[in-house]
Swiss-Prot record:
It comes from Pongo abelii (Sumatran orangutan). The lineage of its organism: Eukaryota, Metazoa, Chordata, Craniata, Vertebrata. Residues 42-107 form the SUZ domain. The gene is SZRD1. Keywords: Acetylation, Phosphoprotein. The modification Phosphoserine is found at S37, S39, S51, S105, S107. Residues 89-100, 109-130 have a biased composition (Basic and acidic residues). Belongs to the SZRD1 family. Residues 66-81 have a biased composition (Polar residues). Residues 111-152 form the SUZ-C domain. InterPro entries: SUZ (IPR024771), SUZ-C (IPR024642), SZRD1 (IPR039228). It comes from the Eukaryota. Signal peptide: none annotated. This is SUZ RNA-binding domain-containing. PROSITE patterns: SUZ (PS51673), SUZ_C (PS51938).
């Protein structure tokens, strides 16, 4: 770089051809470096043509999941254990026990006998004591007209 001449302006360097020589020199250097550090050859990409027959479609197999003990179960068998069938008397006894635990009574008949005290009784007034429903005024329209009484 020390022995290179520096031009007064870029116009003088362009006229003398100095810029062209420097560019060619740098281009040769970069080409040499690229040859030294050659990358492995690029693999060509094959684009399949639609006119050629395609291969068979890939095989899809549906596999069954093994159960917890490693044996594949059949689709008809259920994974739930079968519960023993209870008789009507056993079911009624369990129902009565649960009802007593939750509601405090064993059967619904016990509650029907007791009157319901939670609801307030409605007091009905005799017809005479009711106040008459008198209309105090008839509404007027916004412009002072008769309002609802106005006939169309």
């Amino acid at each position: 770089m020390e022995d290179e001449e520096v031009a007064e302006s870029w116009e003088e360097a362009a006229d003398s051809g100095e810029i062209d020589r420097r560019l060619e020199k740098k281009l040769k250097i970069t080409q040499k470096e690229s040859r030294k550090s050659k990358s492995p050859p690029k693999v060509p990409i094959v684009i399949q043509d639609d006119s050629l027959p395609a291969g068979p479609p890939p095989q899809i197999r549906i596999l069954k999941r093994p159960t917890s003990n490693g044996v594949v179960s059949s689709p008809n068998s259920t994974s739930r254990p079968t519960l023993p069938v209870k008789s009507l008397a056993q079911r009624e006894a369990e129902y009565a026990e649960a009802r007593k635990r939750i509601l405090g009574s064993a059967s619904p008949e016990e509650e029907r006998e007791k009157p319901i005290l939670d609801r307030p009784t409605r007091i009905s007034q005799p017809e005479d004591s009711r106040q008459p429903n008198n209309v105090i005024r008839q509404p007027l329209g916004p412009d002072g007209s008769q309002g609802f009484k106005q006939r169309r």
